[in-house]
Design a protein with these regions (language model features):
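Short, low-complexity, polar/charged sequence segments that are solvent-exposed and flexible
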Residues: 16-18, 53, 82-83, 92-93, ...
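Glycine-rich phosphate-binding loop
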Residues: 1-8
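Generic preference for flexible, low-structure residues
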Residues: 18, 50, 87, 108, ...
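A conserved active-site cap/scaffold subdomain adjacent to cofactor or substrate pockets
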Residues: 23-132, 148
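Short, intrinsically disordered, mixed-charge
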Residues: 2, 36, 94, 98, ...
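Hydrophobic alpha-helical scaffolding
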Residues: 20-24, 78-82, 153-161
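A glycine- and small-aliphatic-rich helix-loop capping segment at beta-alpha/alpha-beta transitions
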Residues: 9-21
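C-terminal non-catalytic interaction/assembly regions of soluble proteins
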Residues: 127-201
Length: 202
């Protein structure tokens, strides 16, 4: 399975799509990619996060997928963060290597997607085109890691120090314990970014 399959599968079942309904499947994959990392779509992966209200308690996104694969993104009213063309674009560009987004069901052409703001915290995504899936896919293997817990947060965009501080403050606000309640605690910011990157990987 893939992250986006959690959304694509139910949409395909609900709408009765065939395995070669490439455009509809591509729309659902793009919708799944849009919400697969939760609050990254509502401001958590946005370079201009300092302009987004309520980042200390960001609302989770949702996606309404239509019969043709077009989608309306939104979030619950009264929660922090925002759903905008900027926040959705930032998430759609996350972890893609190029305009062709390969999946087990369809290859989604991210260079065909169009976004329109439909109102506060509502973005309409449409126009996405799909092609047959590739012959091969990558594989992930996981294993248990013991009794210790480690949390990593990948930060992208500008103002990395400010974003790291925001995330740390939000974590302790939500955590029922304080730093002194732990036997061992280490928080550090590891920088691997480049001042003037030439590639997406940098």
């Amino acid at each position: 399975t893939t992250d986006a399959a959690v959304v694509c599968g139910p949409a395909a079942w609900h709408h009765g799509w065939k395995r070669n309904d490439w455009d509809a499947l591509a729309g659902a994959v793009a919708a799944g990619h849009g919400i697969e990392c939760g609050t990254q779509a509502t401001g958590g992966n946005y370079s201009f996060f300092t302009e987004v209200p309520g980042m200390e308690r960001v609302g989770f996104p949702w996606a309404e997928i239509a019969q043709d694969g077009s989608t309306v993104f939104g979030k619950h009213d009264g929660t922090g963060g925002e759903v905008s063309i900027g926040t959705i674009t930032s998430q759609l560009l996350y972890e893609i290597g190029g305009p062709e987004y390969f999946g087990p069901d369809v290859t989604t052409r991210f260079d065909t997607i169009e976004l329109e703001q439909q109102g506060p915290d509502r973005v309409h995504m449409h126009g996405g085109k799909g092609e047959p899936p590739p012959e091969t896919l990558k594989v992930c293997i996981n294993r248990p890691g013991g009794f210790r817990n480690e949390m990593s947060v990948c930060l992208t965009g500008i103002d990395i120090e400010a974003k790291a501080k925001l995330i740390e403050d939000a974590f302790w606000e939500a955590c029922p314990y304080g730093p002194d309640d732990f036997e061992f605690l280490k928080i550090r910011l590891v920088r691997t970014d480049e001042p003037n990157p030439e590639t997406n990987e940098q």
